[in-house]
């Protein structure tokens, strides 16, 4: 099984940018003009009360829909992970390490000395950002809790997500990294996840900003103030928001995320709208803030704002290409993971 996004490399297969542009515009125009689509019909009732809202008001409307959920105990999470984070081969799906093959139950918690020893419960949105109180619903919210390698989890600590300009620590094969931030607007130490999970974590953070909208201002007074703006909207500081939006665009919603969304819904009885509606973050924070959301007739932002194809791309360029859902499927090469003989292999 491969968890990576399809890519089209233009090397040695020359297609003129002009011809490619015409082809893609034709496809996207057909989509925008009303090809039959039932992709969002099943979620329409759940999100119906947010229909017609835009920007900040849309985020608040979504918050009212998703914030109430069945709160789990911390002990429940071990069993919950079996439903939410199980690889096709039955092993734990670890998003921090590419070398682990953890068995549910047998390898949970306990002492660890190195990467690959044990997995634990990771608050991808650090619990110290709200004071660590177990009384907060976020403490056990599965939409931001993941089973991860204990050693790499400790390497991250409560560092914010970011992109590193130089590596001070890293997991095996450089899958996850720690170092000074290269993103304009922040230069402190950050934790950079692997490319193929950046979109997953971006949508996790969009969910947190939405479900816990009323708490975000207070959370910014703690260590969370590195990424959080101290308000309900936009909720994130400019550097963090720009980065997360880019991550979501570069790493679109995957089958893994959709399956996990359904599994969490079966347990907590709420959903992540940014998975249900790919590109929804553009309606809240991005280029589609002036477009009214329609839960039953959702328009992917790519079909609204169009596409950009370089006029004279060099022969070795990665040209932006979108699929029929408006998801970018070619931009840069990403790390890949596959299951081979029962082992998770990075390539």
Annotated model-derived regions:
Residues 25-38:
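Bacterial N-terminal signal peptides
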Residues 111-303:
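Domain-level detector of nuclease and nuclease-like folds
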């Amino acid at each position: 099984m491969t968890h990576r996004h399809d890519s089209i490399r233009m090397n040695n297969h020359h297609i003129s940018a002009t011809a490619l542009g015409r082809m893609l515009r034709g496809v996207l125009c057909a989509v925008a003009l009303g090809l039959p689509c039932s992709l969002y019909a099943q979620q329409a009732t759940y999100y119906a009360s947010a229909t017609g809202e835009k920007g900040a008001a849309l985020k608040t409307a979504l918050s009212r829909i998703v914030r109430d959920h069945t709160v789990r105990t911390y002990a429940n999470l071990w069993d919950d992970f079996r439903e939410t984070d199980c690889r096709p081969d039955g092993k734990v799906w670890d998003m921090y390490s590419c070398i682990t093959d953890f068995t549910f139950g047998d390898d949970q918690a306990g002492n660890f000395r190195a990467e690959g020893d044990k997995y634990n419960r990771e608050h991808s949105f650090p619990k110290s950002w709200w004071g660590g109180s177990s009384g907060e619903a976020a403490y056990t919210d599965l939409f931001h809790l993941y089973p991860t390698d204990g050693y790499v989890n400790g390497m991250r600590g409560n560092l914010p997500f970011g992109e590193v300009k130089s590596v001070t620590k890293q997991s095996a094969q450089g899958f996850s990294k720690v170092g000074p931030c290269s993103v304009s607007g922040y230069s402190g130490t950050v934790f950079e996840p692997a490319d193929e999970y950046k979109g997953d974590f971006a949508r996790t953070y969009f969910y947190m900003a939405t479900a816990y909208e009323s708490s975000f201002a207070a959370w910014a007074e703690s260590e969370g103030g590195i990424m959080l703006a101290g308000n309900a909207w936009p909720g994130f500081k400019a550097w963090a928001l720009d980065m997360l939006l880019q991550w979501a665009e570069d790493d679109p919603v995957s089958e893994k995320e959709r399956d996990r969304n359904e599994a969490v819904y079966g347990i907590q009885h709420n959903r992540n709208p940014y998975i249900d509606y790919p590109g929804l973050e553009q309606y809240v924070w991005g280029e589609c803030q002036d477009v009214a959301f329609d839960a039953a007739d959702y328009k992917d932002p790519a079909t609204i704002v169009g596409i950009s194809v370089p006029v004279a791309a060099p022969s070795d360029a990665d040209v932006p290409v979108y699929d029929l859902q408006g998801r970018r499927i070619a931009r840069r090469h990403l790390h890949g993971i596959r299951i081979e003989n029962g082992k998770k292999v990075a390539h």
